[in-house]
Amino acid sequence: MLDVAVAYNRFKFLGDEFLTWLWFIIENDPGHLKTLSPELLSLEIGNRIVLENRRHQGLERITINGDDAKLEEGVLALRKGAVVTEMNLCFKSGDQEWRFTIKGESLNLSGFKTPLAGSVETAEDLEGAVIEKAFLYDQAIQFVDNLFKNFIKLRISNQWQSKIVPQIRKWVNAYAG
């Protein structure tokens, strides 16, 4: 049995590959996302993306911030071998919108902004508002879980090396913004 720290360090690349793949899917095949969540209206990269390039015993970190940030610098980093290590996402379903950040190394979700829950006018409304807020968090978490399950199925399939990786390389090399 692997020690937890050893397993963490050994497999943390999967989260980074997941986020890199997710960026590719968001840009190139948003219809694929709808097959995973039919109620999905859109999934977009939010106001922050972090990439890391681990080369020659060094670490280069590229952070792109801002609501209108251009992602060309991030794609250039991908061309040089970087992977996405953190990504802010905007998930829209129906008339509701969630914003949150995923860290690749742990798949930790943070900075949650959920749709507004119902207003609390009486003490009896409080329990319902708490349950509704928990439900709203759970919807986004389940969506990310489904995305990751789909990624893992692809990652261990023969399609990963023969089809997906070449498509990602083609996208990175042809990216125009």
Please provide the spans of the model-predicted regions.
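Intrinsically disordered, low-complexity, charge-rich terminal extensions
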Residues: M1-G177
